[in-house]
Amino acid sequence: MEPVDPRLEPWKHPGSQPKTACTTCYCKKCCFHCQVCFTKKALGISYGRKKRRQRRRAPEDSQTHQVSLPKQPAPQFRGDPTGPKESKKKVERETETHPVD
């Protein structure tokens, strides 16, 4: 083994980097090109930021999908169907007719 210059950083040692540059190709040869290519391409591990996927936009002429959707029925409310105002009036009438002494 050849002696390595101690002043060189470990990533700049001879033989630490491949002679050819990394590519975006995913063939077997390129996947095993170097350790970085192996982890990114062969194993699929990347620690960078995840890109946001854009939502697919519907073509402009496809407006029929909106028309074919059935309308939902109005929500059914539980409790007194007359509403809170009328129920208060009923309570007031009952208290007027039956005063508590």
From Swiss-Prot:
This is Protein Tat. One of its GO terms (cellular component) is extracellular region. Belongs to the lentiviruses Tat family. Residues 22-37 are annotated as: Cysteine-rich. It is found in: Host nucleus, Host nucleolus; Host cytoplasm; Secreted. Transcriptional activator that increases RNA Pol II processivity, thereby increasing the level of full-length viral transcripts. Recognizes a hairpin structure at the 5'-LTR of the nascent viral mRNAs referred to as the transactivation responsive RNA element (TAR) and recruits the cyclin T1-CDK9 complex (P-TEFb complex) that will in turn hyperphosphorylate the RNA polymerase II to allow efficient elongation. The CDK9 component of P-TEFb and other Tat-activated kinases hyperphosphorylate the C-terminus of RNA Pol II that becomes stabilized and much more processive. Extracellular circulating Tat can be endocytosed by surrounding uninfected cells via the binding to several surface receptors such as CD26, CXCR4, heparan sulfate proteoglycans (HSPG) or LDLR. Neurons are rarely infected, but they internalize Tat via their LDLR. Through its interaction with nuclear HATs, Tat is potentially able to control the acetylation-dependent cellular gene expression. Modulates the expression of many cellular genes involved in cell survival, proliferation or in coding for cytokines or cytokine receptors. Tat plays a role in T-cell and neurons apoptosis. The modification Asymmetric dimethylarginine is found at residues 52-53. The keyword Secreted applies. A motif (Nuclear localization signal, RNA-binding (TAR), and protein transduction) lies at residues 49-57. It comes from Human immunodeficiency virus type 1 group M subtype B (isolate MN). Asymmetrical arginine methylation by host PRMT6 seems to diminish the transactivation capacity of Tat and affects the interaction with host CCNT1. Acetylation by EP300, CREBBP, GCN5L2/GCN5 and PCAF regulates the transactivation activity of Tat. EP300-mediated acetylation of Lys-50 promotes dissociation of Tat from the TAR RNA through the competitive binding to PCAF's bromodomain. In addition, the non-acetylated Tat's N-terminus can also interact with PCAF. PCAF-mediated acetylation of Lys-28 enhances Tat's binding to CCNT1. Lys-50 is deacetylated by SIRT1. Residues 49-86 are annotated as: Interaction with the host capping enzyme RNGTT. Residues 1-20, 47-101 are annotated as: Disordered. The MN isolate was taken from a pediatric AIDS patient in 1984. HIV-1 lineages are divided in three main groups, M (for Major), O (for Outlier), and N (for New, or Non-M, Non-O). The vast majority of strains found worldwide belong to the group M. Group O seems to be endemic to and largely confined to Cameroon and neighboring countries in West Central Africa, where these viruses represent a small minority of HIV-1 strains. The group N is represented by a limited number of isolates from Cameroonian persons. The group M is further subdivided in 9 clades or subtypes (A to D, F to H, J and K). The cell attachment site mediates the interaction with ITGAV/ITGB3 and ITGA5/ITGB1 integrins, leading to vascular cell migration and invasion. This interaction also provides endothelial cells with the adhesion signal they require to grow in response to mitogens. The modification N6-acetyllysine is found at residues 28, 50-51. Zn(2+) 2 binds at residues 25, 27, 30. The keyword Transferase does not apply. Residues 1-12, 83-101 have a biased composition (Basic and acidic residues). Residues 1-24 are annotated as: Interaction with human CREBBP. A motif (Cell attachment site) lies at residues 78-80.
